[in-house]
Amino acid sequence: MSSKGSVVLAYSGGLDTSCILVWLKEQGYDVIAYLANIGQKEDFEEARKKALKLGAKKVFIEDVSKEFVEEFIWPAVQSSALYEDRYLLGTSLARPCIARKQVEIAQREGAKYVSHGATGKGNDQVRFELTCYSLAPQIKVIAPWRMPEFYNRFKGRNDLMEYAKQHGIPIPVTPKSPWSMDENLMHISYEAGILENPKNQAPPGLYTKTQDPAKAPNTPDVLEIEFKKGVPVKVTNVKDGTTHSTSLDLFMYLNEVAGKHGVGRIDIVENRFIGMKSRGIYETPAGTILYHAHLDIEAFTMDREVRKIKQGLGLKFAELVYTGFWHSPECEFVRHCIDKSQERVEGKVQVSVFKGQVYILGRESPLSLYNEELVSMNVQGDYEPIDATGFININSLRLKEYHRLQSKVTAK
């Protein structure tokens, strides 16, 4: 059978994408396997050997950890991005980073197709494909879990296991956890399986990035985090003097400290873009510390009215990232606006990391809008208390008029 052309498969080395690799070959494609090193615990060389053994024409292992931190996580920190008030977007931010490199490989190798193992019910299919179509409008996407000839043949894990046995695909010898996991440098997510019942508590052995807060050390770690233009540039452990100032080292160190103290666990039900609710359990250790520290230095240095506008932009940014529109013109516009808002967000924040919590201890900044003399209860400063009388009178006028009308309506 003549080849239908080359396809770059986002390959993890797991059962699903290993079966997809062989299935794509069955369909007549030359498969190029692509593994993104985005900070997950993975034996990449073993995965390379496995992909080649299964018939991949080429295998690319690309380390995108540094660009993930600097080009995706840092903008999220600047924006204080939270989806539905709780989710720090660990998976959502990783997908455009992974897909961008996939497109680069496809263009470099002259491949007309890309493929992924995302399910037809989730958000990731949208995130991967919107990135691909944005960066390479002519690319063609093969999404097996949306193709009847695939999902009618493989109706569950047992079907995949049987297919693997038939085609010599190595099957994991360790028992599979009764839930699915997805890990990157920023977080790890747990979904599906026994977690689909939202009433079920997370089993004690589920968490892998963070210590049980009840078993965490009995003394806190105190960290000083320095920001410039809203981006963390240095972290110092006040207790032992440990310092990190490169993006990747800084982030990994915060993961280590936060994980040791059980910081960054959430268990939520969220609204998927596709329209259904899903239950997810997430661990985001470093991201949680940075969220709190950045929020504090921002409030210390940013004008009140600018911050109100920026908060709205942060909500929009979170929504766009979650729904896969990283490369949209509106997301580009929002990122530029947030960048502008961060020009004065500079200074140091001290935090205590202890028993699952992040406590702000203090802050300082050369660009602070905080005026100690002006706000002091002991010094009058450049402020006349009598001026507050007129301020209150003017602001009460609207309320007086509203309640005057309400009195008339009530009297009828």
Curated annotation (Swiss-Prot):
Its EC number is 6.3.4.5. GO terms for cellular component: cell body fiber; cytoplasm; cytosol; mitochondrial outer membrane; mitochondrion; neuronal cell body; nucleoplasm; perikaryon. PROSITE patterns: ARGININOSUCCIN_SYN_1 (PS00564), ARGININOSUCCIN_SYN_2 (PS00565). This is Argininosuccinate synthase. The lineage of its organism: Eukaryota, Metazoa, Chordata, Craniata, Vertebrata. Keywords: Acetylation, Amino-acid biosynthesis, Arginine biosynthesis, ATP-binding, Cytoplasm, Ligase, Nucleotide-binding, Phosphoprotein, Urea cycle. The modification N6-acetyllysine is found at residues 112, 165, 176. L-aspartate binds at residues 119, 123-124. It comes from Rattus norvegicus. Disulfide bonds: none annotated. Binds and is activated by Bj-BPP-10c, a bioactive anti-hypertensive proline-rich decapeptide, part of the C-type natriuretic peptide precursor. The modification Phosphoserine is found at residues 177, 180. NCBIfam families: argG (TIGR00032), PRK00509.1 (NF001770). Pathway: Amino-acid biosynthesis; L-arginine biosynthesis; L-arginine from L-ornithine and carbamoyl phosphate: step 2/3; Nitrogen metabolism; urea cycle; (N(omega)-L-arginino)succinate from L-aspartate and L-citrulline: step 1/1. Belongs to the argininosuccinate synthase family. Type 1 subfamily. Its main location: cytoplasm. Homotetramer. Interacts with NMRAL1. Interacts with CLOCK; in a circadian manner. Forms tissue-specific complexes with ASL, SLC7A1, HSP90AA1 and nitric oxide synthase NOS1, NOS2 or NOS3; the complex regulates cell-autonomous L-arginine synthesis and citrulline recycling while channeling extracellular L-arginine to nitric oxide synthesis pathway. One of its GO terms (biological process) is response to steroid hormone. GO terms for molecular function: amino acid binding; argininosuccinate synthase activity; ATP binding; identical protein binding; toxic substance binding. The keyword Magnesium does not apply. One of the enzymes of the urea cycle, the metabolic pathway transforming neurotoxic amonia produced by protein catabolism into inocuous urea in the liver of ureotelic animals. Catalyzes the formation of arginosuccinate from aspartate, citrulline and ATP and together with ASL it is responsible for the biosynthesis of arginine in most body tissues. Indirectly, may be involved in the control of blood pressure. L-citrulline binds at residues 87, 92, 123, 127, 180, 189, 270, 282.
